[in-house]
Amino acid sequence: MHYTGTIWRPPYEAYSLLVQVTAGCTHHSCKFCTLYEDLPFKFKLSPFSEVKADLAEASKYYRKIPRIFFTGANPFVLSTEKLKTLAKMVKEYYPFYKTIGCFARITDIMPKSLEELKELRALGYDGITIGVETGDDESLTFMNKGFQSKDVLEQCRKLDEAGISYNFFYLTGIYGAGRGEVGAKKTAMLFNQLNPKIIESSMLTIYKTSELYQEIQKGNWKEESEIEKLIELKTLVENLTINTRIVTDGASNLIQVRGNLPADKKKLIKHLEYQISNADEASLLELEVLCDIFDFSKPLLHRLG
């Protein structure tokens, strides 16, 4: 199998076959992100011969996998024709596959027409994961995400119309000190107009190699406290009114939260309120450092510097 650098996938894709079709990120400019700094290039498309060889190799061992996940930061940036070709390759080796997932940026959806998206859905593209992070335009601009909340609304409604389901990544702590609750409410207002199947929340972790760390050093941005991050997460849950699943499965999270909304809302809020009322900032900081220290490829958090 051809894999380049660290391979990232959502926790809920644990049972999908991971096939590399791209490596790196076309944007690669978010101030907080260090995920692809181990690569000597910004973005690369895998040769189709390699993709085909990987599918052939995997099919010798796993013949009945229903879902394929294309790796890379945003394979959905590829043209519709390339995505169709990749789906046909999957069909050749996995004739009974059901769906294909991948990461996508909002900007990857923009150039694709509704008819193109419907074609992709017919070939199995479904359950794509989008790193929205927040619905707060101020934070989207500061973190250099490359899109605004109105773009999220327009493009995800296009996915809805095409029948392609999607999941959102939400980044707790992205707003900075004193803005957590305001940002969470703005995000809930955006998400409530859409239909994410899963909202996967991760807590912002700041590495010394990130551009965001340099902003902190210059005094341009201040991190939320750990307790404020928990309050922010509670605020998001309180203000969501859609049918969705919210989870905090990633290693960066201080606590694990899993539930279906609106059915589990009261239970989740009660759990978060308990954690907040019993939280000690120093202990939470220590916990975050201990969680992070297992990633030996990264410098320690700036708090240890």
Indicate where each model-derived feature is located.
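Auxiliary Fe-S-binding modules of radical SAM enzymes
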Residues: 1-13, 192-305
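Conserved SAM/AdoMet-binding glycine-rich loop
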Residues: 59-165
